[in-house]
């Protein structure tokens, strides 16, 4: 629940969770590909719009990565520093080694755990799309607007505002709620079944690194510095590529776009 309400709070405050956007934009990208396939032009120009769209998506994700890493690192560092000032003890003095080891791709199953988080990002995108489609089909906003009790209690104008807000925000709220449930319960399920299951998301990893460094008083061998940096980059890339790849694959299947078109898309992105 802590994860779920945390993600909902991020969403409602207008902030962005890194790697969440790609799974939500795959349908738009698939539409762009479909339109490109219909163009009567040179082969190398068919997917120029996709390449530009993908480049914008990648740039926005890079900014989200940097923003999430800086914010999570700073907040985590501030919390452990504040805890030491308040209680007079370093609360991560005995756990810093595990926190940093978990961020290393050669000392832990970081890649697998990052891929699991990517799958959950993909599923949360599916949930958001499904809720949005159901709302449109069931005329969700109209039903809220015409609810007699709400109209009497809030008035017509406020009820319409509430309906519009719920229609816009509800898919994201439910999506983030379930994303939090998936992320927060994975390690517990793994422990119950005696499986090495866990999640790694770039935001959490950067926070763990901050706490681990504070616990170690920032005294690490140079190789560990390198590996935790490499691990952070790998986690972000795996989160992105798994969630985006799965979402794009589903979107392609729904529009009957052949798998052979992927090579043409890669070439277009490379040229761009």
Regions of interest found by a model, annotated:
Residues 1, 56-78, 111-114, 168-189, ...:
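Transmembrane alpha-helical segments and their cytosolic interface motifs
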Residues 1-41, 60-84, 120:
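Core alpha-helical transmembrane segments of integral membrane proteins
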Residues 136-272:
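Long, compositionally biased intrinsically disordered regions
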Residues 1-24, 115-135, 182-188, 236-249:
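Hydrophobic alpha-helical membrane-embedded segments
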Residues 77-93, 192-202:
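Membrane-helix interface motif
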Residues 20-32, 90-94, 137-144, 199-205:
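Interhelical loop segments of eukaryotic multi-pass membrane proteins
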Residues 32-59, 99, 151-168:
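Short membrane-interface loop/juxtamembrane segments of multi-pass integral membrane proteins
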Residues 1-4, 84-119:
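Long, highly hydrophobic alpha-helical transmembrane signal-anchor segments
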